[in-house]
């Protein structure tokens, strides 16, 4: 299943990410089963800027959440994937890599502009299928 979460500011996205990690932890999801993917360099990601103490930028240890660029995670997978920093789906092939990495649950934190673009892309795809 996919859960989309809309944000309107960087601060709101950061808070949503922190809350999501806390919620997953309360549900019993182990940190090593969570990966945060970003289209940006990990050091430029909201996950790094909010200072999540459990985020590891290198291969994950027993208690860490891996933070990686979408491109660097190609060919890998995780039970739970969180895609952060989504402001546009202009590079859809990159996002396709990210959205296909989750084996159990996918969360996408997206801006309002990205949401509108995603809906437009879905409509275009559906219209093409009807032709």
Residue locations for each model-derived region?
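Core RecA-like ATPase module of SF1/SF2 helicases and allied nucleic-acid translocases
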Residues: 1-131
């Amino acid at each position: 299943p996919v859960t989309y979460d809309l944000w309107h500011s960087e601060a709101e996205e950061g808070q949503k990410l922190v809350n999501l990690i806390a919620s997953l932890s309360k549900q019993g999801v182990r940190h090593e089963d969570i990966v945060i993917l970003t289209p940006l360099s990990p050091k430029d990601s909201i996950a790094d800027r909010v200072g999540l103490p459990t985020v590891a930028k290198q291969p994950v240890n027993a208690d860490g959440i891996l933070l990686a660029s979408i491109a660097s995670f190609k060919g890998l997978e995780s039970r739970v994937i969180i895609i952060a920093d989504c402001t546009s789906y202009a590079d859809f092939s990159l996002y396709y890599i990210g959205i296909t990495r989750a084996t159990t649950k996918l969360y996408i934190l997206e801006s309002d502009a990205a949401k509108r673009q995603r809906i437009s892309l879905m409509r275009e795809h559906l219209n093409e299928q009807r032709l």
